[in-house]
């Protein structure tokens, strides 16, 4: 009975240790499924550590297996103790010696099997973290280029006073350009019913009408091209799994902005076709400056979203998949450490504020264009011989609609003098903000902690702000020539692009990119251990 009492615990412990060691070599399907989930990353790390211990040698593997079971630890503790007991002490002692030798042989065989099979056994792969493909980034840059083009064409359409030449909004029929003489005359007759023709353009010929019609038609066709070009590839991206986590929602948001942009365009044109609206605008046949600013602002938002999302996705891919540094930094560690630093964080806030300022200045330019405010006070730096116009011109009761004159704020958006003055002040503020940011970034201890690309983009923003300010002054002095004014509008978008790129260069990696980078580093370490 005594021998059975000794044999059963020791044999059970040895068998338990052997089963535990053997189970390390091949994961069950449930474990493999668990490892492929997000929570399985920790399980995969444990498997990688086990593989390292097993490949390090039978001695270390014996310790790892022994640590996994209390019964196994008792066996190894017994095996590791020095043999001070005499073999001939007693029959019970001899039996214990035989059991110990058997347990040692059984466990050693199991460990050897685990060690030899560790290199060929299949451990669960780490879960794949989907990242937005570089193909999507290039696609967004193409859309951004098309938006840039439509902003320029839209500026030319406004400057040539062509925006009211097409009096209908037909998404399908509007694609067809009039071809025959009869079709052109039919469109011309429709235009003759508009307030613009009755008040300003009774002198134009059919050939003149064709010219302004082509500008508006080109603007609308380019808008349709942008819509189709944006929506068409999305099903493929979803099917081919080219989109990372949250990317589809971002694309849906941009698509919504594009749709709102098209609707706002027609809503803006309607304000210039309706006679009552024209009377509300002072009897001048032009579109509402509020709707014009909203139309331009939506275009800038679409452009900004495409540029920022495209750059962010490209940076995440480069960091997590290629494991390369960003912004001129050479290593991943240097990139993450730099972007998490206080200097990068402070600069990120400054660049974000500057981006908002550039955007606001561009919107104020839309009010200048909508009110033809560039045709007054065509001098610089003064306005009527002073740095600012007389106060009674800035705050007129004429623009108030309430009897108590409590809506004087309308002067900010409806008084041409106030609108031009505001645009000047915002332009000065933007210029000196860019200069201040450059002087801040060029300080040696600041520059050394910023990505080299960020400094170059800030420097480029400084150069572009000088050019943009010069274009604005020249446009004012020469009474708003068409091509110069269109270049000034395009310059605002170039400046916004540089500031957006500077902000994107300071963007910290997304959570998805960090997770993908962590798994890539684990795979790299596992490959080194296997070798």
Language model features: what each stretch is:
Residues 11-19:
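N-terminal alpha-helical interaction modules that lie
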């Amino acid at each position: 009975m005594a021998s059975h009492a000794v044999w059963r615990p020791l044999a059970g412990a040895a068998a338990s240790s052997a089963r535990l060691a053997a189970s390390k070599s091949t994961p069950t399907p449930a474990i493999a499924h668990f490892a492929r989930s997000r929570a399985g990353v920790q399980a995969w790390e444990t498997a990688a550590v086990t593989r390292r211990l097993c490949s390090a040698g039978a001695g270390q593997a014996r310790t790892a297996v022994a640590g996994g079971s209390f019964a196994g630890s008792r066996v190894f503790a017994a095996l590791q103790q020095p043999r001070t007991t005499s073999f001939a002490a007693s029959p019970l002692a001899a039996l214990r010696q035989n059991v110990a030798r058997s347990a040692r042989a059984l466990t050693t065989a199991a460990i050897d099997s685990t060690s030899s099979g560790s290199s060929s056994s299949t451990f669960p792969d780490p879960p794949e973290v989907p990242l937005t493909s570089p193909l999507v980034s290039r696609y967004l840059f193409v859309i951004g280029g098309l938006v840039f083009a439509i902003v320029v064409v839209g500026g030319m359409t406004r400057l040539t006073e062509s925006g009211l030449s097409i009096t209908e909004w037909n998404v399908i029929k509007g694609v067809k350009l009039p071809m025959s003489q009869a079709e052109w005359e039919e469109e011309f007759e429709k235009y003759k019913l508009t307030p613009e023709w009755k008040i300003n353009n009774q002198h134009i010929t059919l050939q003149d009408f064709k010219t302004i019609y082509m500008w508006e038609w080109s603007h609308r066709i380019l808008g349709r091209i942008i819509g189709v070009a944006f929506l068409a590839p999305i099903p493929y991206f979803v099917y081919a799994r080219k989109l990372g986590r949250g990317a589809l929602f971002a694309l849906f948001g941009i698509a919504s902005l594009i749709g709102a942009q098209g609707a706002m365009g027609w809503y803006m044109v309607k304000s210039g076709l309706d006679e009552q609206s024209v009377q509300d605008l002072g009897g001048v046949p032009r579109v509402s400056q509020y709707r014009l600013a909203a139309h331009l602002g939506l275009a800038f938002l679409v452009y900004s979203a495409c540029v920022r999302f495209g750059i962010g996705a490209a940076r995440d891919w480069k960091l997590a998949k290629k494991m390369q540094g960003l912004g001129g930094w050479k290593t991943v560690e240097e990139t993450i450490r730099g972007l998490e630093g206080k200097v990068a964080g402070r600069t990120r806030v400054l660049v974000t504020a500057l981006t908002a300022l550039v955007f606001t200045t561009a919107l104020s330019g839309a009010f200048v264009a909508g009110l033809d405010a560039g045709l007054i006070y065509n001098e610089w730096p003064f306005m009527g011989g002073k740095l600012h116009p007389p106060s009674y011109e800035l705050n007129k009761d004429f623009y108030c609609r309430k009897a108590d004159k409590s809506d004087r704020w309308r002067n900010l958006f409806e008084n041409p003098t106030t609108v031009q003055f505001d645009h000047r002040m915002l332009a000065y503020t933007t210029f000196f903000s860019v200069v201040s940011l450059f002087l801040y970034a060029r300080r040696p201890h600041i520059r050394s902690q910023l990505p080299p690309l960020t400094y170059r983009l800030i420097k480029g923003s400084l150069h572009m702000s000088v050019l943009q300010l010069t274009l604005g002054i020249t446009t004012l002095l020469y009474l708003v020539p068409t091509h110069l004014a269109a270049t000034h509008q395009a310059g605002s978008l170039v400046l916004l692009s540089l500031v957006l790129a500077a902000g994107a260069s300071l963007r910290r990696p997304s959570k998805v990119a960090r997770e993908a980078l962590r798994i890539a580093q684990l795979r790299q370490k596992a490959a080194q251990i296997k070798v």
